[in-house]
Amino acid sequence: MRVLAVNDLSCVGKCSLTVALPVISACGVTCDVLPTALLSTHTGGFEGYTFLDLTSELPSILKQWKTLGLTFDFIYSGYLGSESQIDTVLFLQKEFLKAGGKLVVDPVMGDAGKLYDGFTPSFVQKMRALCKKADYVLPNRTEACFLSELPLETDGKTLAAALQKLTPCPIVTGVEEEGEISVYYQSENTVRRYATPTTQGFFCGAGDGFASSFVAALAGGKTIEEAIPLCAEFTTACIERSAREVEDKRYGLNFEKELFPFVKKLKGE
């Protein structure tokens, strides 16, 4: 199996590609990358970071890949910094995704009830168009509300049901409720929920950890019903370890020591 991860590369602060590449690779799946931007650190709490938009470089990269005959079993998109980069993912799906391959979209746009700086209603509309082409979409609660055009207080079950208008397999992540954090997803025409205990605090990269492990699980042959509990438990274990061991949470999850147990569970050991 071969996965292409399309996301930004933050040199410091574990998120995006610095989570996707090790997590997917550790699961025995080839992971190639297409960086959408290069940052000195991620933007969650750091000041003075550098940002290099790589949009203009992407066509040259893809032109060379075409000469190599590259194709992918999964294309997994995360942070896309412009509407043009959404078009790039659509092009990748058309030109580089194998027959029967899957497009997994993590529609990174916002959190805590608002869009991230620089994201506009026009971008949201374009992201909806991408989600309509995707096999799996993994928004957090805020992103799910913007995609479905429902109020921010909408519950996870309603959001997952509403998002079926966009994609056959919506997976709403990070829904906090009654001391638990829940994932809502569609399975056999029913909205299902998987919950784990909430750990107080904000943990950068948690969404990337869940999405990357989910892609790895699918690539390893797991069904959505099998993958979501495994990936939710893996993400929770990473968060709990980080709460104990990481003083400055901006630097991301301590996921490395949880990878081996996760891989063993994927293999059924």
Regions found by a protein language model. Name each.
Residues 2-105, 109-117, 256-260, 264:
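Conserved N-terminal subdomain of the carbohydrate kinase-like
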Residues 10, 37-39, 81, 109-111, ...:
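Glycine-rich beta-alpha junction loops
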Residues 11-12, 191-205:
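Short pre-catalytic strand/loop immediately N-terminal to key active-site residues, enriched for Gly-Thr
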Residues 117-191, 225:
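Conserved phosphate/ATP/ADP-binding segment of small-molecule kinases
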Residues 146, 200-224, 228:
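Short, small-residue alpha-helix embedded
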